[in-house]
């Protein structure tokens, strides 16, 4: 999983929606935030973020994303202005059909 430490890095990496031909069909592919978590003000946030990221990857939702992502998912770190800590987001580039499945099955659940 790649790490992008700043908003600028994310914007340079992020791509707009694309259309690709996969198995003879035109498929729309775009970025989707698949998981978010917050962390307090710690000395090394990247080191402390490894455990929640790994734990999420072991869930059913995390395994689905790792299997269906078009390229390796990445995480982005932002400052959290409310508690002076950090916000992390995991972003994956997936087909529109996989995004719909993910949203219906996993968004709003504890998994």
Across the structure, where does each feature detected by a protein language model lie?
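Structured alpha/beta or helical-core interaction and ligand-binding surfaces enriched in interleaved
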Residues: 2-83
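Short, compact, well-ordered microdomains
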Residues: 80-111
């Amino acid at each position: 999983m790649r790490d992008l430490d700043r908003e600028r890095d994310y914007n340079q990496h992020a791509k707009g929606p694309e259309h690709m031909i996969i198995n003879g069909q035109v498929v729309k592919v775009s970025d989707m935030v698949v998981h978010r978590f917050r962390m307090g003000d710690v000395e090394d946030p990247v080191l402390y973020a490894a455990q929640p990221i790994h734990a999420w990857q072991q869930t059913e939702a995390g395994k689905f994303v790792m299997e269906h992502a078009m390229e390796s998912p990445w995480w982005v770190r932002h400052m959290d202005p409310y508690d002076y800590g950090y916000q992390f987001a995991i972003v994956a580039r997936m087909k529109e059909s996989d995004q719909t499945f993910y949203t219906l099955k996993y968004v709003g659940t504890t998994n």
